[in-house]
Amino acid sequence: MDAFNPADSSLRINVAASGDTALVAEAPGKRIKVHALRLSAAGAVVVQIKDGSTVLETFNFPAAGTMPPLELRHAPYYTGTTNTALNINLSGAVQVDGRIEYTVA
């Protein structure tokens, strides 16, 4: 973690199943804060980022190759609730790739 990138963890997103998939597991007494997110879809799909079952943001990919970057590095873009996992939800079985940078504190 540094002044230009407060995130202390990152992971590759590689999801193709419709429905919820856990990105970051819940941690007892801690919150997940997302500092950067990049997504790319192989086809038309609606992607939701969720704090447990609560939708934080919805991205509508009308076609393959579109990509919404969220590159906010000094303040968290999303702050989850305590003891809650960060999930991704796909409206259909379409390959979605990307990267997420986050902290758990």
Q: What do the predicted segments below correspond to?
A:
Residues M1-A105:
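Beta-strand-centric surfaces of beta-sandwich/beta-rich domains
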